[in-house]
A protein has these predicted regions:
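Rossmann-like NAD(P)-binding element
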Residues: 31-34, 41-64, 70-113, 144-148
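Short beta-strand element of Class I
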Residues: 26
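A short, structure-level motif marking secondary-structure boundaries and short turns
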Residues: 1-2, 21-22, 101-104
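Gly/Ala-rich phosphate-binding loop of Rossmann-like dinucleotide-binding domains
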Residues: 16, 20
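Short coil/turn segments
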Residues: 8, 21, 29
């Protein structure tokens, strides 16, 4: 199983490390600094890094042999980015996604905006899940467990 993580702040890196320890392949994209993403990859904090959201979506939805699984297996994308970057990131990400894909938002976004995003994404067949735990260190394990035990088994083949 693999997913894409957008934003590589310390909380994102810790979540990624936890998921990697549990057998999940985590590809990272930094909205700020590709070199920093490469350093995190070299340290083993992420499974790989990409230079754009487009490449992240392609990587998460490929089988490693160059074949895309778009429409067959949902792509799962976690966002852990500052509130001012959310709108631009989603404007770029959503058109790249397909029905059945999942966005998990760990940002500090306003709840009303998140409710609007959930409605908009649901019309496209995309699941938008607002977790709203940005900055809470105890949430790292909880969110990873939610993903690994709830979302992954019901949405992803083993």
């Amino acid at each position: 199983m693999k997913l894409g993580i957008i934003g590589l702040c310390p909380i994102a890196v810790n979540m990624s490390r936890n998921m990697i320890e549990n057998g999940i392949e985590v590809w990272g994209y930094s909205i700020v600094d590709y070199e920093s993403a490469c350093e995190k990859y070299e340290k083993g904090y992420i499974s790989g890094c990409v230079t754009s959201l487009e490449y992240l979506v392609q990587t998460v939805k490929s089988d490693g042999l160059g074949h895309t699984s778009a429409g067959k297996v949902p792509g799962i994308f976690q966002m852990i980015i500052p509130e001012p970057k959310i709108e631009d990131t989603l404007d770029e990400l959503i058109p790249l996604l397909d029905e059945g894909d999942i966005i998990i938002d760990h940002s500090s976004n306003d709840i009303k905006k998140c409710q609007e995003l959930e409605k908009y994404c649901s019309k496209l067949g995309i699941s938008y899940i607002f977790v709203g735990v940005y900055g809470a260190t105890h949430a790292i394990n909880a969110c990873s467990k939610i993903f690994a035990h709830t979302i992954a088994p019901t949405r992803m083949p083993t």
